[in-house]
C-alpha cells in the first residue's frame, strides 16, 4: 500500500502532525469530533482552520452542539460549515490526502493516528459523508437550545 500510518503519543509531535495536516489540506477538510473538542478547535489550532479557509479549502465540521460548547460552535461557523449529530463519539479529520484520529484524556489529545494510505483516507471520507447526511444544520440545532 502506498502511504504510511503513524501513531504519535508525544504532545509536541501530535500538535506538529495536526498543523501539518492543516497545511496539507488543499480542497477538503472534514472533521467529526465529540462535544468537548470544539474548544480545542478554536484554541490551539484555530489559525490552521482560518488559513485553510483563505486557501479555498471546503471545511465541514460535525459535532454534538450543546449548551456547554455553543460559544465555541458559533466561532467555528466563521470558518466551517457546521452540523450537529446527537451523541457523536471519537475525533477524526480527513482531507484530500490524509486522515487523523485522536484519543483524548481530559482536554488533551494523548494519541494521534495519522495516515496517508489512500484506501484508509477514502474509507474515512465515506464515513464522514454518511455522518454528514445524518446530521442537521447547526442553525437548526442552535434554535433548539
How would you describe each model-predicted region?
Residues 1-4, 14-15, 37-145:
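PLD/PLD-like phosphodiesterase catalytic module centered on the HKD motif
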Residues 1-38:
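Interdomain hinge/linker segments and adjacent boundary elements that couple functional modules
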Amino acid at each position: 500500500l502506498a502511504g504510511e500510518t503513524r501513531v504519535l503519543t508525544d504532545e509536541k509531535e501530535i500538535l506538529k502532525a495536526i498543523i501539518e495536516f492543516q497545511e496539507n489540506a488543499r480542497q477538503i477538510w472534514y472533521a467529526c469530533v465529540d462535544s468537548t473538542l470544539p474548544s480545542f478547535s478554536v484554541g490551539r489550532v484555530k489559525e490552521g482552520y482560518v488559513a485553510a479557509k483563505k486557501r479555498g479549502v471546503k471545511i465541514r465540521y460535525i459535532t454534538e452542539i450543546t449548551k456547554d460548547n455553543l460559544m465555541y460552535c458559533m466561532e467555528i461557523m466563521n470558518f466551517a460549515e457546521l452540523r450537529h449529530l446527537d451523541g457523536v463519539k471519537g475525533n477524526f479529520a480527513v482531507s484530500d490526502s490524509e486522515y487523523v484520529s485522536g484519543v483524548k484524556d481530559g482536554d488533551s489529545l494523548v494519541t494521534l493516528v495519522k495516515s496517508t494510505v489512500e484506501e484508509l483516507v477514502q474509507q474515512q471520507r465515506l464515513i464522514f459523508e454518511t455522518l454528514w447526511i445524518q446530521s442537521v444544520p447547526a442553525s437548526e440545532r442552535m434554535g433548539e437550545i
